[in-house]
């Protein structure tokens, strides 16, 4: 097998289209039992604290409920609210039996007002009953590789077998934010709709949306056993970071601090530029390969980036601090 490897240190910074100015001081102190900050595009973990602890997640469960519903339902379909969707314990938009709701409106009630009744109505609309919908939710998270997450309901009310980790939840959110409909919903400060002639106004419970211009999502949560939970997202210079804090009293303050510190510490850098050429020689024949889409990562001043080409399998392997991070396909363009 023919392989060529090389190490890219801080010289890589010159390849970036973004000016690099690493921060001298960042503050990662926080009160969370578990926390994780992740880059949405690459999935790189930028900060972690007990990120693999299995913990209750409260209403951050609804992130999964929302993306599963978005991917499996016609959002313009109208449903009639049934008796078993009314009077659900906890936060609610106060659905009434017989009301006619568009699925899209239920999603806003779910994510902005954290309606447990909306979660039940969506589960029934998508899968016919709660059990089948929860099964679909569990299949969804397992397909993403989130093996430390298990769900028993669509709303997050406490159950000892209902849990996630900060890492899993960050990974789920990075996936969900790739969906434009999901992103639009969770970044909305307010949403109005008309239900059977009555105007409903949903105001988002995510306080960071009002106090921090970088914030663009996602979801709050609270139960006595889970404590205060929050998943926040923020963007700057085409970077979007996701932060999960579980059982964290000052959840908004800690989330903003953690994301701000990561935005200061890490800068997007092209590890491999778009249309980068790789040359190999086989029996004196010159073989030229190209990567069609550049590969970039948030990196900090201490990172070691190692790139290895595997021409036999037409792959480029990217190592971050000596651990394999990703593999990228390359194409032969001449022979």
Located regions from the model:
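Active-site-adjacent loops and short helices of periplasmic peptidoglycan-processing enzymes
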Residues: 21-167, 171-180
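Hydrophobic alpha-helical segments, especially transmembrane helices
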Residues: 3-4, 63, 236
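Domain-terminus/edge residues, biased toward the C-terminal soluble/receptor-binding domains
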Residues: 146-147, 158-335
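Sec-dependent N-terminal signal peptides of Gram-positive bacterial secreted proteins and lipoproteins
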Residues: 2-23
